[in-house]
């Protein structure tokens, strides 16, 4: 009786095995088989005690050279210290903009463009020329003084200006300087004026030397006329084929 029960159970197992081989339950079991529990790489490093440092895994060249250069100084360089502390070597002092931003201050105002930089100094420092001035060291002012006469050079105001300033119709007496002071003040202007007495005398001697020679001269031309008369008396004026020599030829002997 026991043997019959064992045989029946064996047949049942064979039937179930045949059904499992032909059906899908075996494929699902094979696919859902749990694999080995492999932890991630970081977990493995942490378990082995080699947790990665936050800095670079390969030390910089400065650190390698310092480690290989034995005996090295007692205090390592700043780059080696930063790498040993787990910090990447960076600039020790931040830029000025970063410092201002960290302190809550706004950075410097932007630099103005080049045209504005060129325009601002000219408007600020360029000298303003007066209407009567010119860059050529006051030549226009000298011409105005010459055209106005010795009164403008000596600084004496005119009668019309006095009337306009006072508002009265009566002509004001012109302010006169003493004879010596007035002569000293007006002498430079008098010498520069083209219509002065000395200029007229020089021009008369050059343009009318025949008249001065015949009539004896007038004003400043008397000396030249007397000299020509003396030369004519000596016969020096008749040395060019009986023709009268001009003044230049007489004085220099260059010809008729």
Curated annotation (Swiss-Prot):
GO terms for biological process: blood vessel diameter maintenance; cGMP biosynthetic process; negative regulation of protein kinase activity; receptor guanylyl cyclase signaling pathway; regulation of blood pressure; vasodilation. Changing residue 38 to A: Low decrease in ability to enhance AsS activity. Residues 188-198 have a biased composition (Basic and acidic residues). It is found in: Secreted; Cytoplasm, Cytosol. Expressed in venom gland. In the N-terminal section; belongs to the bradykinin-potentiating peptide family. Residues 149-199 are annotated as: Disordered. Residues 24-30, 41-43, 61-63, 78-84, 96-102, 114-116, 122, 128-207, 226-234 form a propeptide. Changing residue 39 to A: Important decrease in ability to enhance AsS activity. Residues 1-23 form the signal peptide. Negative results: does not bind to type-1 angiotensin-2 receptor (AGTR1). It comes from Bothrops jararaca (Jararaca). Its main location: secreted. One of its GO terms (molecular function) is toxin activity. The modification Pyrrolidone carboxylic acid is found at residues 31, 44-45, 48, 64, 68, 85, 103, 117, 123. PROSITE patterns: NATRIURETIC_PEPTIDE. This is Bradykinin-potentiating and C-type natriuretic peptides. Keywords: Cleavage on pair of basic residues, Cytoplasm, Disulfide bond, G-protein coupled receptor impairing toxin, Hypotensive agent, Metalloenzyme inhibitor, Metalloprotease inhibitor, Protease inhibitor, Pyrrolidone carboxylic acid, Secreted, Signal, Toxin, Vasoactive, Vasodilator. It holds the Pfam family ANP. GO terms for cellular component: cytosol; extracellular region. Disulfide bonds join 240-256. PANTHER family: C-TYPE NATRIURETIC PEPTIDE (PTHR12167:SF2).
């Amino acid at each position: 009786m026991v043997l019959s029960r064992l045989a029946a159970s064996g047949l049942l197992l064979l039937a179930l095995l045949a059904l499992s081989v032909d059906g899908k339950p075996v494929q699902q079991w094979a696919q859902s088989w749990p694999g080995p529990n492999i932890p991630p790489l970081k977990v493995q490093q942490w378990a082995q005690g080699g947790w990665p440092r936050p800095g670079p895994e390969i030390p910089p060249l400065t650190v390698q050279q310092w480690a290989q250069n034995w005996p090295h100084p007692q205090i390592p360089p700043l780059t080696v210290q930063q790498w040993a502390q787990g910090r990447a070597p960076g600039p020790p002092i931040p830029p000025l903009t970063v410092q201002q931003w960290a302190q809550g201050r706004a950075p410097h105002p932007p630099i103005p463009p080049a045209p504005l930089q060129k325009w601002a100094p000219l408007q600020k420092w360029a000298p303003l020329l007066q209407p009567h001035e010119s860059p050529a060291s006051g030549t226009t002012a000298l011409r105005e003084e010459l055209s106005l006469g010795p009164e403008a050079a000596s600084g004496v105001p005119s009668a019309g200006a006095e009337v306009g300033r006072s508002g009265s119709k009566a002509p004001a007496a012109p302010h006169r300087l003493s004879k010596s002071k007035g002569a000293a003040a007006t002498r430079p202007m008098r010498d520069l004026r083209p219509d002065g007495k000395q200029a007229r005398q020089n021009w008369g001697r050059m343009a009318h030397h025949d008249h001065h020679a015949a009539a004896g001269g007038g004003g400043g031309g008397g000396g030249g006329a007397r000299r020509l008369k003396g030369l004519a008396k000596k016969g020096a004026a008749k040395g060019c084929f009986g023709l009268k020599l001009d003044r230049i030829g007489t004085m220099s002997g260059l010809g008729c």
